[in-house]
């Protein structure tokens, strides 16, 4: 009977492993085939599929001053939005968990609200504010970061909420405060290191959303990366496709880097736990 059960378990594990491989391959093909097709088009010299291929369009990316300016502005917007979002959300969410737990549902509703509002409706609300800012302060494209912080709130809130839910914020804070730590020390040296993976996830989501945003920038008459790609596609489709592929590869590299950093931190934490879990007197 035991032999039959063991054989059944091995067969089930083999089937599950094969199913995972099939799903992984299907997902890889689903994402990679369009990207490879875009890359092939961006390296094609003529209009025929059998035409010669080179990197002419890729080399022309930096020959477009408007495109370079749009890329620079989008990267700056992504950085500003990520930092502003973290500075706004992390202390607020920690404080609500510690001092105002009854406010958690209200905060969640406010943060998730932009997800239910179409982007074009947000533009209608943003337009008077940006018109006033342009007339009285500045119409620099970096002011879009105010709108983008609101836009990324739902996604970043969920990522940070999952990270804070995985640790005992109250116990860690009380322990640090009882040892004389200031609130800044509690936040910077106790809470943030324990939710570093969640912070990286939120930052990545913020960067990906800002780099891919089109509607708000277009309707507020700003020229970010996606707006410039759309305009460039009317004049030079090869360069616009090359830029689109490059932006996708950039997001992919960020994702892989995030996974690598998160894996390394988990391994270091496991080693630390094992080190302190060994009985005293035994060699390490």
Label the predicted regions:
Residues 2-4, 26-65, 218, 272-273, ...:
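Short membrane-interfacial helix/loop motifs at transmembrane-helix boundaries
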Residues 140-177, 185-191:
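Membrane-cytosol interface at the C-terminal ends of specific transmembrane alpha-helices
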Residues 7-12, 80-111, 124, 128-132, ...:
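Transmembrane-helix boundary motif in ABC transporter permease subunits
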Residues 11-15, 43-83, 234-235:
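Periplasmic/extracellular loop-to-transmembrane helix junction in inner-membrane transport proteins
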Residues 20-24, 69-73, 129-155, 196-198:
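Loop-to-helix entry region at the N-terminal start of transmembrane alpha-helices
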Residues 22-31, 150, 157-162, 183-212:
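Transmembrane alpha-helices
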Residues 8-13, 58-66, 211-269, 281-284:
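Interhelical loop and adjacent transmembrane-helix boundary motif
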Residues 55-56, 103-104, 120-150, 184, ...:
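Membrane-interfacial helix termini and adjacent extracytoplasmic/periplasmic loops
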């Amino acid at each position: 009977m035991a032999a039959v059960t063991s054989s059944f378990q091995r067969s089930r594990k083999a089937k599950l492993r094969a199913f995972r491989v099939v799903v992984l391959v299907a997902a890889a093909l689903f994402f990679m085939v369009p990207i490879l097709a875009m890359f092939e088009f961006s390296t094609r010299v003529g209009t025929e599929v059998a035409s010669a291929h080179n990197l002419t369009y890729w080399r022309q990316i930096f020959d477009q001053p408007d495109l370079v300016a749009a890329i620079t502005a989008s990267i700056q917007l992504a950085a500003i939005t990520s930092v502003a979002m973290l500075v706004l959300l992390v202390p607020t969410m920690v404080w609500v968990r510690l001092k105002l737990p009854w406010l958690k549902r209200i905060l969640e509703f406010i943060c998730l609200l932009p997800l239910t509002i179409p982007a074009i409706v947000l533009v209608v609300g943003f337009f008077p504010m940006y018109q006033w800012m342009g007339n009285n302060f500045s119409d620099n494209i970096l002011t879009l970061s105010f709108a983008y912080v609101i836009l990324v709130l739902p996604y970043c809130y969920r990522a940070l909420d999952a990270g804070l839910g995985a640790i005992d914020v109250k116990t860690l804070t009380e322990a640090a405060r009882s040892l004389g730590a200031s609130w800044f020390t509690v936040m910077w040296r106790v809470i943030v290191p324990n939710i570093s993976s969640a912070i990286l996830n939120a930052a990545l989501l913020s960067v990906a959303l800002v780099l891919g945003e089109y509607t708000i920038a277009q309707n507020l008459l700003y020229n970010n990366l996606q707006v410039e790609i759309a305009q460039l596609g009317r004049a030079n489709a090869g360069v616009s496709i090359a830029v689109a592929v490059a932006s996708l590869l950039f997001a992919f590299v960020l994702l892989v880097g995030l996974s690598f950093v998160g894996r390394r931190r988990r391994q270091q934490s496991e080693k630390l736990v094992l080190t302190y879990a060994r009985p005293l007197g035994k060699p390490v």
